[in-house]
Regions:
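DNA replication initiation on ssDNA origins
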Residues: 1-43
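Alpha-helix initiation and N-capping motif
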Residues: 24, 37, 75, 118-122, ...
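Signature for HUH/AEP ssDNA processing cores
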Residues: 33-103
Length: 190
């Protein structure tokens, strides 16, 4: 989808002045393109691993934050605990925190690259979460697209949130980063 409000870029290189349009990065079309790019990156990352899972983490009533909002540190701590349980095996992840559409109840979706969908992994994920319910399934293109939408700020309906609540967010593994394997495998790259 083409940018709805392209920005004119004026560039001079070796004495030659060039004017060209670049995407604004803010309009709905740009955010949709960005989301689609991240969904593709998640799918490419998934191709690097034999198995990948999609996990949903929800709070039970005893562990629901007060006020009931997303807590990014809960997600970070979960990933750290899970890494400790699976060491020395390393895995990568892409995660988002969102609110339920009807109840605004906070929960998290996590794509775990390199982990199989089996009872032992489910047991370890449940133990590492420790704050409520867990569901695990195979990663699909639709699920990759679903979590990718949270990389776009302001694409969700944040005006429905009470003032001061944590906004919906995305977090992912860093270094070497998604697509690194693709870059290295290209002829003539790096």
């Amino acid at each position: 989808m083409e940018c709805l409000f392209p920005v004119v870029q004026d560039e001079e290189n070796a004495g030659v002045r060039t004017l060209f349009n670049r995407p604004c990065g803010y309009c709905e079309a740009c955010r949709l393109t960005y989301r689609q790019t991240w969904a593709a990156r998640i799918q490419l990352e998934a191709q690097c691993h034999a198995e990948n899972i999609f996990v949903t983490l929800t709070y039970d009533q005893d562990h629901l934050p007060d006020p009931p909002q997303l807590v990014p540190d809960h997600l970070s701590a979960f990933v750290k605990r899970l890494r400790a349980r699976f060491a020395p095996l390393q895995f990568r992840f892409f995660a988002c925190g969102e609110y339920g559409s009807r109840t605004l109840r906070p929960h998290y979706h996590v794509v775990l690259f390199g982990l199989p969908c089996n009872a032992e992994v489910e047991r370890q994920v449940l133990s590492a979460w420790g704050a409520g319910h867990v569901s695990i399934s195979q990663l699909s293109p639709a699920r990759a697209s679903y979590v990718a939408k949270y990389v776009c700020k302001d694409i969700s309906d944040d005006d429905k949130l009470p003032e001061g609540y944590q906004r919906e967010f995305a977090r992912m593994s860093r270094n070497p980063g998604n697509w690194c394997w693709f870059y290295r495998s290209c002829s003539g790259c790096g």
